[in-house]
C-alpha cells in the first residue's frame, strides 16, 4: 500500500502516526494509545516493553508466552502458585502440625509469636494499632498514664519503678531524695525532722 501522506504507519492499527502521538520501539512507530500489551492491554513504556517479532508485550505476559516452560518457570518473582507438580510425579510429605512450647520460661520472642503482648496495667492484649512502648513494655494508649496522678505520658516523659510508670513530678515526690530542700520544687525550702 503506498504511503501518500508521508507519515509512518502504526505497528498495531496501520494508520498514520503523527509526531505528537508517536512512540518508537525497535524501529517501528506506534500511537501512544496503541502502545499496549497484546495480551493484557496494559500501557507500555521503554522499561516495560518486550518485543517478539512485530508484537509487543509487557514483560510479564512475554515471560508467560515465550519464557522457559516447566515446573517453577514462567510465573516471575513474587508470584504464588498452587501447582505442586503432582502431574510430574513429585510427591510431597505432610509437615507435622505445630505444637506450642511446654517450657514455662519461654523466650520473649516465643511469647510474642504465641500471642499478643499483654498490657502491664490492665493485663489485656495489646495490638499494634493501640500500642505504646515505655519502660521496656507494651501498653495501651489509654493505660499509658502516671500510676499516681493519671497524667498522660510519653516515652520521653516517664520514670519507672517496680514495673509501674510515673510522671517525673510524681516520681520525684514519691521516690526522689528526701530531706532539707528536696521535693517541693524550685525555690522552696522545707525542714523535715
Swiss-Prot record:
It is found in: Nucleus. The modification N6-acetyllysine is found at residues 84, 112, 131, 137, 161. GO terms for cellular component: cytoplasm; extracellular exosome; focal adhesion; nucleus; Z disc. GO terms for molecular function: actinin binding; RNA binding; structural constituent of muscle; zinc ion binding. The keyword Phosphoprotein applies. Keywords: Acetylation, Isopeptide bond, LIM domain, Metal-binding, Nucleus, Phosphoprotein, Repeat, Ubl conjugation, Zinc. Gene3D superfamilies: Cysteine Rich Protein. The modification Phosphoserine is found at residues 81, 192. Interacts with ASCC1; ASCC2 and TRIP4. Could play a role in neuronal development. This is Cysteine and glycine-rich protein 1.
Amino acid at each position: 500500500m503506498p504511503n501518500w501522506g508521508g507519515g509512518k504507519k502504526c505497528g498495531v492499527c496501520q494508520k498514520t502516526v503523527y509526531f505528537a502521538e508517536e512512540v518508537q520501539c525497535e524501529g517501528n512507530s506506534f500511537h501512544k494509545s496503541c502502545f499496549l500489551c497484546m495480551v493484557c492491554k496494559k500501557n507500555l513504556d521503554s522499561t516495560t516493553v518486550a518485543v517478539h517479532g512485530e508484537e509487543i508485550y509487557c514483560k510479564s505476559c512475554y515471560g508467560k508466552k515465550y519464557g522457559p516452560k516447566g515446573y517453577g518457570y514462567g510465573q516471575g518473582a513474587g508470584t504464588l502458585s498452587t501447582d505442586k507438580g503432582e502431574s510430574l510425579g513429585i510427591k510431597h510429605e505432610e509437615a507435622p502440625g505445630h505444637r506450642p512450647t511446654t517450657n514455662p520460661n519461654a523466650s520473649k520472642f516465643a511469647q510474642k509469636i504465641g500471642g499478643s503482648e499483654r498490657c502491664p496495667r490492665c493485663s489485656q492484649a495489646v495490638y499494634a494499632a493501640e500500642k505504646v512502648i515505655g519502660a521496656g513494655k507494651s501498653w495501651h494508649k489509654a493505660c499509658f498514664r502516671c500510676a499516681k496522678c493519671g497524667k498522660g505520658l510519653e516515652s520521653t516523659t516517664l520514670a519507672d519503678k517496680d514495673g509501674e510508670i510515673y510522671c517525673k513530678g510524681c516520681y520525684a515526690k514519691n521516690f526522689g531524695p528526701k530531706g532539707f530542700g528536696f521535693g517541693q520544687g524550685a525555690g522552696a525550702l522545707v525542714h523535715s525532722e
